[in-house]
């Protein structure tokens, strides 16, 4: 964080604050984490760049979604239509993760599946494995909830196969409760 701030790297500064927020919140101090959100917002707003403002919105929405605080998420993220939105290209994979989580939390499984194709296309173009894994996990959860068991199993299998080679487990741990019925 200090190196990013000293060298005026706004994107890195936001990322460092986001990682600090995750650690603080996972250690059981959500109040401190929510306070750090204000710093992320201030850094982004002071930058004057839309890219950093979108980054801050997504970082904050990511954490709010895991604390069932969707009322605090920016409306453009909740209402989003990934095919029609102007999201800066570097943010598309992260947007897909956040938007998918919000759809799962809101039980908007059909809406998620309607956006799945365009988000997966973007994730594959940018070769973003984490995004691909999350998209497949959210598709497995959505299909399971829509009583499409074979499709749910296929999406879960795809997520596992994609994650296996690089040993990526976090998306499965974070979504374990919702995945319990899929496997």
Model-based region annotation:
Residues 2, 12-29, 52-68, 93-107, ...:
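Tandem amphipathic alpha-helical repeat scaffolds
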Residues 85-94, 105-128:
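A compositional/structural signature marking long, glycine- and acidic/polar-rich segments
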Residues 72-74, 90, 127, 143:
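Juxtamembrane segments at transmembrane-helix boundaries
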Residues 1-9, 38-49, 74-85, 117-125, ...:
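Amphipathic alpha-helical segments of tetratricopeptide repeats
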Residues 111, 118, 125-183:
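C-terminal non-catalytic interaction modules
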Residues 49, 56, 151:
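Polybasic, glycine- and aromatic-enriched phosphate-binding surface used to engage nucleic acids
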